[in-house]
């Protein structure tokens, strides 16, 4: 005797219609044995479709007990019910319920994907099923390219993909012509003779006549359950048997297959609505482009500014007489001396030091007179300042010892006195009343901190002090901090040393490193402000993604129902839509980053002084942001999709 496969005891299913309850099933008691061919008949509204949904674990009874192969379904979770549908049931719908964007073989493969069957095995089985059902030449055809009978055979193949121990056929011939309907019925009869339990839900008496057992329903109750003694004789099959149930893969294989399916589905959904997808991505594209470009511009600007600061001596400390800039008493303080320079130079934290004295003097070359700042400095001055020579050389210690009448001029002085075509090296100019030979010209560097047209001339300190100005005290001292030494600590040490030597604090220091720190902080603050604006743009883009995904869930409700019917769990559906949201955002991110590089290239053509600097960190951050936006803003639509009721989803047009 066959075992009891499906058992219903006291099953009731009611629906709320407004303020009234509608009883679709009323105290149903039914047992269906393995291998039976059962027809459930009744007029429209009799409850036969609701009974099929309960039998197929697509719907839950309000009361009573339903067991599948001895397993009580009332205690199962939604995911466990999905596994039950996947492993035991195969659905054949009146309207086929094939996914229109997938080929026939891909529609058939779907249940095996959720079962974790390897790709090679499921493709082979799907192909054999379709060939067995006479569709060998239509494997890659989409539903729109198939006739009604062919689509129903694809639906049958899908129902058999995971074995189809129990076949639930809802009006399987209702949408077919007589020839196609007869072919489908012959297939179902063959399946039953091969050991499958087949349950036909129909109002067509001719279809029900093929069953060995007929159950009649009216107003949610079983009014008759009889053995069909008038069943027509079934001819012995002449065709080959259907391929056996495939061996299911492990969960890892299932996850890999699901991810592949999710990405394929996401891509198909995106390219099916190109304009909508582009508009959805627009906010993400603008946001990512803004973030990456702002960071690149900020980094480029910061490097440009810091480079200019370093050019004028970023690791230098200036010492001046008085208490601060603008001190009226500083002119009377004459305590800074050459011995202070020597004392500072001997300290381990000082790379080099130079004295400074200077005046504005009249400078003459032939019949050209100009006013220039003349400074007396040590030979190490140019090293301290990081100044390079464009022409010639700087003066050396021997020049200083001899009080040589040699000078180094800047580019502005060269242009004013000699013009761009005359070689100034070796030319004699009159500095005040002192004739001096030009031995070097400093490099012409464009600097945002020195845009003036001032003329500068440098000569050995000893020459300026002994031959030109007659001044023994210093106007200032410049020290260069040794590499690796903290500038702030060195500044404190310089203050302590000079205060100890002078016995009082009659000087002040100016550390250009503080300017660098200020520039860096300002740059970071500005970049943060602009990035926040860009983040707002990203958030707006994310909301757009969420809106369009909610629309997508609504449009694809029936697809979700089909996937649930063939065994998709809630987590599978949730993953499907999350992947789609992430893909939208990632593609938008890639386009945004690409646009940033285009902007950087155009920027380099328009602005020669400095360039946008793209960092790997900002690009990686952009990708991470894109992914997070997809996850965060795609979660609600994905959750909504996963929580859909299979019956309601299948009923949507």
From Swiss-Prot:
Membrane topology annotation: Multi-pass membrane protein
Residues reported to bind ATP: 42-49
SUPFAM superfamilies found in the cross-reference section: P-loop containing nucleoside triphosphate hydrolases
UniProt domain ABC transporter: residue ranges: 6-244
Gene Ontology cellular-component terms listed: plasma membrane
UniProt keyword annotations, A-Z: ATP-binding, Cell inner membrane, Cell membrane, Membrane, Nucleotide-binding, Translocase, Transmembrane, Transmembrane helix, Transport
PROSITE patterns the record matches: ABC_TRANSPORTER_1 (PS00211), ABC_TRANSPORTER_2 (PS50893), MACB (PS51267)
GO molecular function terms listed in the Swiss-Prot or TrEMBL record: ATP binding; ATP hydrolysis activity; transmembrane transporter activity
Pfam families: ABC_tran, FtsX, MacB_PCD
Principal place of residence: membrane
Spans through the membrane: 252-272, 278-298, 526-546, 583-603, 616-636
Highest taxon listed in the record's lineage: Bacteria
Self-association state and partner proteins as the record states: Probably part of a tripartite efflux system, which is composed of an inner membrane transporter, a periplasmic membrane fusion protein, and an outer membrane component.
Protein name: Probable syringafactin export ATP-binding/permease protein SyfD
Name of the gene this protein is made from: syfD
């Amino acid at each position: 005797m066959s075992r009891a496969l499906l058992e219903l005891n006291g099953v009731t299913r009611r629906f709320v219609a407004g303020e009234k309850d509608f009883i679709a099933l009323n105290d149903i008691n039914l047992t269906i044995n393995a291998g039976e061919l059962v027809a459930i008949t009744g007029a429209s509204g009799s409850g036969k479709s609701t009974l099929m949904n309960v039998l197929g674990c697509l719907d839950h009874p309000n009361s009573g007990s339903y067991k599948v192969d001895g397993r009580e379904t009332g205690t199962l979770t939604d995911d466990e019910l999905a596994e039950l549908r996947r492993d035991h049931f195969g659905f054949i719908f009146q309207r086929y319920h094939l996914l229109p964007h997938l080929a026939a073989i891909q529609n058939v493969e779907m249940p095996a994907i959720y079962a974790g069957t390897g790709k090679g095995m499921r493709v082979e089985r799907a192909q054999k099923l379709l060939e067995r059902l006479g569709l060998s030449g239509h494997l890659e055809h989409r539903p729109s390219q198939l006739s009604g009978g062919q689509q129903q055979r694809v639906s049958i193949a899908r129902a058999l993909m995971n074995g189809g121990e129990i076949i639930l056929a809802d009006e399987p011939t209702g949408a077919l012509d007589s020839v196609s309907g007869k072919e489908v019925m012959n297939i179902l009869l063959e399946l039953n003779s091969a050991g499958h339990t087949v349950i036909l839900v129909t109002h067509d008496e001719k279809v029900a006549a093929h069953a060995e057992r007929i159950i009649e329903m009216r107003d949610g109750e079983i009014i008759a359950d009889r053995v069909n003694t008038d069943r027509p004789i079934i001819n012995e099959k002449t065709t080959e048997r259907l391929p056996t149930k495939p061996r299911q893969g492990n969960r890892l294989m299932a996850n890999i297959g699901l991810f592949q399916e999710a990405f394929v589905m996401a891509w198909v959904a995106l390219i099916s609505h190109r304009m909508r997808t582009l508009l959805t991505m627009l906010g993400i594209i603008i946001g990512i482009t803004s973030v990456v470009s702002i960071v690149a511009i900020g980094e480029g600007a910061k490097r440009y500014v810091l480079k200019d600061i370093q050019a004028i001596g970023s690791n230098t400390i200036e010492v001046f007489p008085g208490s601060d800039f603008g001190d009226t008493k500083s002119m009377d303080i004459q305590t800074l001396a050459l011995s202070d320079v020597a004392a500072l130079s001997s300290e381990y934290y000082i790379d080099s030091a130079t004295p400074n004295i200077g005046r504005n003097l009249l400078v003459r070359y032939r019949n050209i007179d100009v006013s220039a700042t003349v400074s007396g400095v040590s030979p190490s001055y140019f090293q301290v300042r990081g100044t390079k020579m464009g022409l010639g050389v700087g003066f050396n210690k021997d020049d200083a010892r001899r009080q040589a009448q040699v000078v180094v001029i800047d580019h502005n002085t060269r242009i004013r006195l000699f013009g761009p075509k005359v070689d100034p090296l070796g030319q004699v100019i009159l500095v005040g009343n002192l004739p001096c030979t030009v031995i070097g010209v400093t490099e012409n560097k464009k600097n945002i901190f020195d845009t003036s047209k001032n003329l500068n001339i440098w000569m050995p300190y000893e020459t300026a002090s002994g031959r030109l100005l007659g001044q023994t005290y210093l106007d200032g001292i410049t020290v260069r901090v040794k590499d690796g030494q903290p500038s702030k600590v060195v500044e404190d040490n310089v203050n302590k040393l000079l205060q100890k030597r002078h016995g009082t604090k009659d000087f002040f220091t100016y550390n250009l490193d503080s300017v660098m720190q200020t520039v860096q902080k300002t740059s970071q603050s500005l970049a943060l402000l602009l990035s926040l604006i860009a983040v707002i743009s990203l958030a707006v883009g994310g909301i757009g993604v969420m809106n369009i995904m909610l629309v997508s869930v609504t449009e694809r409700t029936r697809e979700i129902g089909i996937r649930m019917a063939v065994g998709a769990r809630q987590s599978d559906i949730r993953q499907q839509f999350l992947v789609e949201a992430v893909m939208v955002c990632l593609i938008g991110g890639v386009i945004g980053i690409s646009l940033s590089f285009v902007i950087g290239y155009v920027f380099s053509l328009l602005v020669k002084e400095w360039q946008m600097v793209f960092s790997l960190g900002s690009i990686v951050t952009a990708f991470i942001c894109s992914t997070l936006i997809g996850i965060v803003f795609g979660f609600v639509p994905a959750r909504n999709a996963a929580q859909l009721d299979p019956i309601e989803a299948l009923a949507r047009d």
